[in-house]
Swiss-Prot record:
One of its GO terms (cellular component) is nucleus. Transcription factor which regulates nonfermentable carbon utilization. Activator of gluconeogenetic genes. Coiled coil: none annotated. Belongs to the ERT1/acuK family. It comes from the Eukaryota. GO terms for molecular function: DNA-binding transcription factor activity; DNA-binding transcription factor activity, RNA polymerase II-specific; RNA polymerase II transcription regulatory region sequence-specific DNA binding; zinc ion binding. This is Transcription activator of gluconeogenesis SNOG_12336. Pfam families: PAS_13. It is found in: Nucleus. One of its GO terms (biological process) is cellular response to starvation. It comes from Phaeosphaeria nodorum (strain SN15 / ATCC MYA-4574 / FGSC 10173) (Glume blotch fungus). Residues 32-45, 150-159, 169-179, 300-318, 362-384, 392-402, 546-561 have a biased composition (Polar residues).
């Protein structure tokens, strides 16, 4: 085989195909037959399949020339073959075929040993992002600026010096890179300078402190050397670094100082710009909170992300924001802000500060923060938070998490089991029920009502005779305890409900029932006087309330006088026909069905005072008055909102409803509570 020409050994950067063929021919010459080498007096080559044959060490990455010629390369640079060919000045690692998910990655990032080939890690400035403009952003002249002396090791900023305008007294402004997490305390202060009147936004090294929060081209952001992890992929190591950066929030610091994103000293990036900070100017200081953010951003939740508040001697503060309201991968929130729930460890997010410290003052702090994003939230000072945290017992591995939602209601059962000293007097309750029936029903309906009451009233009296006072007190305790459970259940449902005793006295209702009928709970329970004049016109016109004396229940001589306003009875909330149907259903289900429940259609009377009744009569008498439609749509009136719900039954004073109710019993199998779910019939009520 003829030797290659002399021109092939020229250090030309252009690799031609004839050069690759010559290098392949050279390999064939080196791997000649044993007979050819033995004739020259050399040791014959071993068989390629011989296991004792010495193997060539495989290189991590072939150079560009050996890769094109498909030759075995070495790890040294320049490699042996390029030195032999005279191409040592152009020997560099070849580029492997990219995977689909790495098509957008630069070629330099895929090189082994990123620190020697990626331009930004050599100290050169990276190319500005497309979103950054090159125009000048005017800035109002601030007060005196102070620089800080470096403390500890820090990442070397770009070596290219950017000229800045000279300040007063011939002192120049330092162009050091500002860290992402400024320190909490600043012990050293440099000479005061004045910032320039305008700063070019297209200089990434100059405006690094206002750039993206997570710069994928900054390996020092994640506090380790990516090239030393031997991942073989820069972006794969970057992903692991991001996971480590986020998981660092669960590690509590060893001291009371702040913990930055890398859990090291805050000055690892070098000195930064301090906004008008100095002992002689305390009003223009820029304090930093324990989450390594400026106090302006700590106290003002509405401040944008990636903004730096610089307090001036004047009352105004200049906010430099180049990220706007963007929340993408370049201008996203802090890694510690991913979990907004409370935590027992110190975090670095203003929105995720220790929620347990604000539990008594503001239990819905997180919900209020998201509901009022444009309004500032009051925050306690870091010193106060650390003081409260120091007084707490040491935290364990398992701690209960305090949710920011509706917490479980504390049940005070002591007032039930220790406060009830006497039973409820059902004798007075049924006497009031008979009096209400005489006032509400006509003669024909009153006879039916008395018949329904006689079906279960004697049975209740006979069972009561077998119970002593302690049994009756225990029965009342069970009633109040069941009532507490029912109230907790009904608060989770938006259905209007009503709870009464077996004698009809109201014991509880919810706000939906008040919206539907106008009856407030204080009036129903007898805490306020009942001023209702809407009786439903149940009696006939020729009858008076005191027409006969034989139908009224006589007063018993041994009873105590009434002390206070009694509770409203359930049949007082219905018209005569609906109340009679209720008494009929209760008489049938009181003893016959152990799990008695029924449903009926009823007209509930709205709560109307004398003033309300006069106003309605005046509106009816006015011929020019036209009733307004509640909600006008193509299909007719549609119920919408609480205001429309309050207008149900405004014309005739009755709300057409569907009632589903069931009976709650005690341990003696006696009916004690009647639970009613009231739902309005909207198609009729809104016409």
């Amino acid at each position: 085989m003829a030797s290659p020409d002399a021109e092939d050994a020229s250090p030309s950067p252009e690799y031609r195909s004839d050069l690759d063929d010559d290098m392949a021919a050279e390999q064939k010459t080196d791997d000649g037959s044993p007979s050819q080498k033995s004739s020259n007096g050399q040791k014959p080559a071993s068989n390629a399949k011989d296991p004792l044959r010495p193997r060539r060490k495989k290189a991590r990455r072939a150079c560009f020339a050996c890769q094109r010629a498909h030759l075995t390369c070495g790890d040294e640079r320049p490699c042996t073959r390029c030195i032999k060919r005279g191409l040592q000045d152009h020997c560099m690692d070849g580029v492997r075929k990219k995977a689909k998910y790495l098509h957008d990655a630069p070629d330099g990032a895929l090189m082994p040993g990123v620190g020697g080939h990626y331009p930004y890690m050599n100290g050169n400035r990276p190319t500005p992002l497309p979103s950054q403009d090159t125009h000048n952003v005017p800035m109002a002249p601030q007060g005196n600026m102070y620089t800080q002396a470096p403390s500890g090791t820090f990442y070397q900023p770009p070596s290219a010096q950017i000229p800045l305008p000279q300040a007063q007294h011939g002192r120049s402004f330092s162009d050091q890179q500002s860290p992402l997490s400024p320190p909490f305390s600043q012990a050293h202060h440099g000479p005061n300078v004045n910032p320039p009147s305008s700063i070019s936004q297209g200089q990434p090294g100059q405006m690094q402190q206002f750039g993206p929060l997570f710069d994928p081209s900054d390996p020092a952001l994640f506090n380790f050397d990516i090239s030393s992890l031997n991942f073989g992929n820069h972006y794969g190591a970057l992903e692991f670094g991001m996971l480590g950066h986020m998981s660092s929030a669960v590690d509590a610091p060893n001291d009371n100082t702040m913990m930055n994103a890398m859990n090291q000293t805050a000055n690892m990036y070098g000195p930064q710009m301090a906004g008008a900070y100095g002992p002689n100017n305390p009003n223009a200081a820029m304090p930093f909170a324990q989450n390594s953010l400026p106090a302006g951003e700590w106290q003002e939740s509405q401040s944008r992300q990636n903004s730096m508040h610089i307090h001036t001697p004047t009352s105004s503060a200049t906010a430099l924001d180049h990220g706007g309201h963007r929340h993408d991968s370049l201008n996203g929130p802090h890694a510690f802000a991913i979990g907004q729930g409370p935590s027992s460890h110190s975090t670095a997010s203003p929105a995720s500060t220790d929620a347990s410290a604000f539990e008594n003052d503001n239990p819905l702090s997180t919900a209020t923060f998201f509901a009022n994003t444009n309004r500032g939230q009051p925050q306690r000072s870091p010193t106060t938070n650390r003081h409260h945290q120091g007084n707490r017992p040491p935290s364990t591995a398992l701690q209960p998490i305090h949710s920011n939602g509706v917490r479980k209601r504390h049940r005070d059962t002591k007032s039930i089991y220790q406060g009830i000293k006497k039973p409820f007097d059902y004798v007075k309750g049924y006497h009031r029920l008979f009096q209400i029936c005489h006032k509400k029903f006509s003669k024909s309906l009153l006879a039916q009502a008395q018949q329904y009451l006689n079906l279960y009233r004697p049975v209740l009296l006979s069972v009561r005779e077998e119970m002593d006072t302690d049994d009756l007190i225990h029965q009342e305790m069970g009633l109040q305890r069941n009532l507490m459970t029912l109230q907790d259940h009904f608060t989770e449902v938006g259905t209007p409900f009503l709870i009464c005793r077996r004698s009809g006295e109201i014991v509880s209702c919810n706000k939906e029932f008040t919206i539907l009928t106008g009856w407030r709970q204080d009036v129903l329970l007898g805490r306020e006087p009942n001023l209702n004049v809407n009786l439903g016109n149940s009696r006939e016109a020729d009858e008076s309330e005191m027409s006969t004396q034989t139908n009224t229940t006589p007063n018993l001589t041994g009873q105590e006088a009434e002390t206070g306003t009694p509770a409203v009875n359930a049949i007082q909330l219905m018209d005569a026909k609906s109340a009679l149907e209720y008494l009929q259903n209760f008489s049938e289900l009181c003893w016959q069905d152990p799990h008695g429940h029924a449903k009926q259609r009823a007209n509930m009377l709205r709560y109307q005072t004398k003033a309300d009744f006069d106003r309605i009569q005046e509106m009816k008498a006015n011929a020019d008055h036209k009733s307004d439609a509640f909600v006008k749509m193509e299909g007719g009136a549609v119920h919408q909102g609480e205001s429309a719900m309050q207008r149900l039954g405004a014309k005739n004073g009755m709300v057409d409803c569907m009632i589903w109710w069931h009976i709650k019993r005690d341990i003696f199998e006696m009916p004690v509570l009647v639970c009613m779910s009231v739902m309005p019939v909207l198609d009729k009520g809104l016409q």
